[in-house]
Curated annotation (Swiss-Prot):
Forms a cyclic heterotetrameric complex composed of two molecules of XerC and two molecules of XerD. This is Tyrosine recombinase XerC. Residues 106-285 form the Tyr recombinase domain. Keywords: Cell cycle, Cell division, Chromosome partition, Cytoplasm, DNA integration, DNA recombination, DNA-binding. It comes from the Bacteria. The keyword ATP-binding does not apply.
Length: 295
């Protein structure tokens, strides 16, 4: 089983050119599936029938996987089995036609503009703080994904034109603007970057000089949020969601926000219209003389 998995990982990395972060997610899901299969005396992919696929989902649910994670696991298995069919290892893809449990509607959490101001108002001149502030200013200014921020190089940034070149999902490149505050924060970081003895051209590096990891970015943002007195857990997704919501609140241009976020489908961006409506409804309830609800 593992030999075919390794061939698939090589295919994803070399031919599909998936990012390391995405590849790790595929590997994590498929390795978990293998554990479930082998614990139940299934030791080859030819033994995987539709009933076995349903059993894997049921077992995963017993282990505490939520709807969204179950859908991801099924998707990873379905794509892998399809690869085996194309390679002639299987005759049929047993995961085709099997649906994951229906996902409940998910509205991403975001910060309001006052909370963003609270987060980014910090005048520390410590090099690590300058780096962290630059990362967060850029992520909020351009709506970057965590993987896009982490993979930036020095030549990805054009300070003069205030543009950043990012490689998004599917290896698609897009050029994004960033604002004055992000520009100032990046320039302050670049003045002290050499103190970290960088080993490559990564824009953001760790204290050891290596490209900063996804996990380190997440931990630093969580720490920063606590230090700045924010309520709730701060993570990269929340900054990206806040960017999208604030852009819609101020422009209502769904297509433009789609392009900025790098969404291939407009339906993915449309989830933010629900957030926008919630904001408008709250304003209406507070402002309209006949809209105020009884306590």
């Amino acid at each position: 089983m593992h030999i075919l998995l390794q061939k698939y990982y090589n295919y994803l990395r070399i031919e599909r050119q998936l990012s390391p972060y995405t590849l790790i997610n595929y590997q994590r899901q498929l390795e978990k599936i293998v554990v479930i299969l082998q614990q139940n005396d299934i030791h080859s992919w030819q033994q995987v029938t539709p009933s076995v696929v349903r059993f894997v989902l049921a077992q995963s649910r017993k282990e505490g996987l939520h709807e969204r994670s179950l859908a991801l696991r099924l998707s990873a298995l379905r794509q892998f089995l399809n690869y085996l069919v194309v390679q002639g290892e299987l005759k049929v893809n047993s995961a085709v036609g099997i649906s994951a449990p229906k996902q409940s509607k998910y509205l991403p959490k975001n910060m309001d503009m006052e909370q963003v101001q609270q987060l980014l108002t910090n005048e520390s001149k410590e090099p690590i703080d300058l780096r962290d502030k630059a990362m967060m200013e850029l992520m909020y200014s351009s709506g970057l994904r965590l993987s896009e921020l982490q993979s930036l190089n020095l030549n990805s940034i054009n300070i003069r034109s205030r543009e950043v070149r990012v490689i998004g999902k599917g290896n698609k490149e897009r050029i994004l603007p960033f604002g004055r505050y992000a520009s100032q924060a990046i320039q302050q970081w670049l003045k002290v970057r050499l103190l970290f003895n960088p080993k490559d051209e990564a824009l953001f590096v760790s204290q050891l000089g290596n490209r900063i990891s996804h996990r380190s970015i997440q931990k630093r943002m969580e720490t920063w949020g606590i230090r700045q007195g924010l309520n709730g857990h701060l993570n990269p997704h929340k900054l990206r969601h806040s960017f999208a919501t604030h852009m819609l609140e101020n422009s209502s241009d769904l297509r433009a926000v789609q392009e900025l976020l790098g969404h291939s489908n407009l339906s993915t961006t449309q989830i933010y219209t629900h957030l926008d409506f919630q904001h408008l409804a709250q304003v209406y309830d507070k402002a309209h003389p006949r809209a105020k609800r009884k306590k």
